[in-house]
Amino acid sequence: MRKLSLLLICCALAATPVSQARQAAPTPQAAVKYGFDEVAGWLTASAELVPADKYTYKPVNTVRSFGELMAHAADGMNWYCGSAKAAKDVAWSDAVEKGGPTKPKVVAALKQAIQGCNTAYGSSTARIDRLMANVAHSSLHYGNVITYLRMLGLKPPSS
């Protein structure tokens, strides 16, 4: 009888987290924010990982340099999150990419863009379609970043 009671208690305890997890489903806004936090962290870590002298590196001549690619990701965050918060569309700006994408400038711009996005993701009135598109755009370019890192002999932060 004692073994049966112990078995029943163990089964009940094991089932408790499962039932609680079903009740605690995240909101769509929270789920999208989770995705943004993940990819933004990887992009920031990548920007900090690559040495400053490699910001001009291009796998081939027909693509952006590493610095230009990271700057484009920051410009994208500024646009997607800015337009998610705005009552009307905002114009795309290549200010970071065209502003001489050195490591100090890119890392600072990326962190600033992430701060701006955190405001948008924290808003209950922000357009979730734009916030989702920001995660998609950032993830797409993080995929590019992985190739650059591997070609430079560096381990991607997500690995």
What are these regions (language model features)?
Residues 5-16:
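Bacterial N-terminal signal peptides
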Residues 16-29:
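Cleaved targeting-peptide boundary
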Residues 26-33, 100-104:
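Active-site rim elements
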Residues 33-37, 41-44, 54-94, 125-159:
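Short, contiguous alpha-helical
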Residues 42, 46-47, 81, 113-116, ...:
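Well-ordered alpha-helical scaffold segments within catalytic/enzyme domains
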Residues 97-142:
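Acidic/histidine-rich alpha-helical segments that form the ligand environment
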